[in-house]
Structure formats: structure tokens, C-alpha cells
Amino acid sequence: MGIFRRIFRQHDQTAGDLGYFGLHFVYQETIRLQYKWRQTFPDALDLAFAACHKQVQYATQAAEALQEAFPEQPLPAHFGFQRTASVLEQRKAYEQALEICQRAKEQGWAGNWAWRMLRIKKKLRERGYPVVSMSSSGMSQI
């Protein structure tokens, strides 16, 4: 687990060495591995969530780097956004989960963002929270 802690402490230096393209995939693998080990190591889930936060923090720069490297390809799935939205939804933090999904969709990351947002909006309605329109047409609700 030491390598992951060092990555979090030195993320600015790592970003300079790897670039946002490389850093995106370092955090993706960190999320994947730590989440896989969550039942084995007591701090694995916290480390996975910390990696999600870092990957989301650099999402815009990573998207630019990926689009520059592969201009003809759509952006891939973003583990940080996906896992963060899932964790927030599980914790019933629906407003924050909806915001994360919206950011991921706006940035163009692949994923089932529209479906996730509909599911979260339904849960908000069931809890009695108003779902307000974002557009003047009223067609897009949050």
C-alpha cells in the first residue's frame, strides 16, 4: 500500500513526470486495485476513494491530453467519476452523485451517465426532493 500513499503525497510531482495522460491511468489502476482489495485491507476503500477524488480533480486536463493523443477516438470510461457516483449514491448523497454524473457527461467521458442521472433523479423524487429544470425549455431536469 506504500506506493499508493506516495502517489497521493506527490501527485503534483507525478503529474509533471507522467503528464495528465499517464496520471489518469495511474489513478485508474489505483482505483481498480484498491477497490478489489477493499475486503482484504482496512484502508483500501479509503485509498480507492482518494484516488477517485484525484482522478476527478485532473479529469479536464486528462481529457485534453487524451483528445490530443487520440483525436479520432471518444474519451474512455472514467473510473473516478463512475466509482465516486456509485459511492455517493450508496451513501444516499444523491445531489452530489447527480453533480458528479453531470460533470462527467459534460466533459464527454464514456459511460451510462444519462441512465445514472435518471435513476438518481427518481430516488430524489421518491425522497420528496424537488427536481428542478436546468434548461429554459424544461426538458432537462436535475
Predicted features, each with a name:
Residues T30-I31, V56, T84-A85, R91, ...:
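Heptad-repeat amphipathic alpha-helical coiled-coil interaction surface used
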Residues C52-Q57, Y94-G111, G138:
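TPR/TPR-like (Sel1-like) alpha-helical repeat modules
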Residues G2-A15, H53-F70:
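Repeat-mediated protein-protein interaction surfaces in helical alpha-solenoids
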Residues Q10, A44-L47, A51, A93, ...:
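Alpha-helical solenoid repeat scaffolds, predominantly canonical TPR units
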Residues D17-T40, D46-T60, Q73-V87, W115:
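Amphipathic alpha-helical repeat scaffolds of TPR domains
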Residues A62-L66, E106-M117:
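Boundary/linker segments of alpha-helical solenoid repeat arrays
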Residues T14-L18, K105-G108, Q141:
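Solenoid-like repeat scaffolds
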